[in-house]
Amino acid sequence: MKSYKLLTPGPLTTTDTVKQQMMFDHCTWDDDYKQITQEIRRGLLKLAHVFENEYTAVLMQGSGTSGVESVLTSVIGSGDELLICANGAYGERMADIAEHAGIKYQIYKEHYNKVPNAQKVAELLDADPAVTHVAMVHSETTSGILNDIEAVGKVVKDREIGRASCRERV
C-alpha cells in the first residue's frame, strides 16, 4: 500500500514514534498516567492565560463536533442567546447543535469563500442586546479558510458579551 503525506486537518499522518506510543496501554489509575493528565490540564490553562484556582480544563475524547456540542450545551444557559458566525459546514453545524439543544440563537451566514466580517458582527450585536454569546469556527476546514478571530474577538470583548452571563452563574 502506498504511504501518503496527508496535509489536511484530519485524518493526520503520524510518525512511527507517535504510532508506537499509541500502542502502549495506559491505565487511568496509574500515577504516571495521572501525572501526564495533570500536566496537560495545567498546560491548557496556561495556554488560556487563566489560573487553576479559578478554572479547570476537562480532557475529552471525541470528535471536534463533540467538543463543540459540549461547550455550547454547557456554557450557554436557558436565558442566553447565541450569535453564530458561519462560513462553512462546521459553522452551520453549530446552528444544528443549537437547534437540537433548544438554544436560542441567530446565525450570521457568510459565503464559504469569505471570512465573517467583524464590522457586520458589531452591527448584529449592537442591533440585538439580548445576545450573550458569540461562536465562530477558527479554521473552517470545508473551505480552508482561517477566520479572523482576533477582529471578531475584539468586537465581542469591547461589548463585554458573555461576561454578565458568566457572572450571574458564579
Predicted regions and their residues:
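Short coil/turn connectors at secondary-structure junctions
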Residues: 1-3, 54-55, 78-81, 102-104, ...
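N-terminal "arm"/small-domain region of PLP-dependent enzymes with the aminotransferase-like
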Residues: 1-31
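Generic structural signal for well-ordered, non-membrane alpha-helical segments
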Residues: 11, 15, 30-44, 87, ...
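Conserved N-terminal alpha-helix of the aminotransferase class I/II PLP-enzyme fold
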Residues: 21-70, 74, 89, 93-99
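Active-site phosphate-binding strand-loop segment of PLP-dependent enzymes
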Residues: 116-167
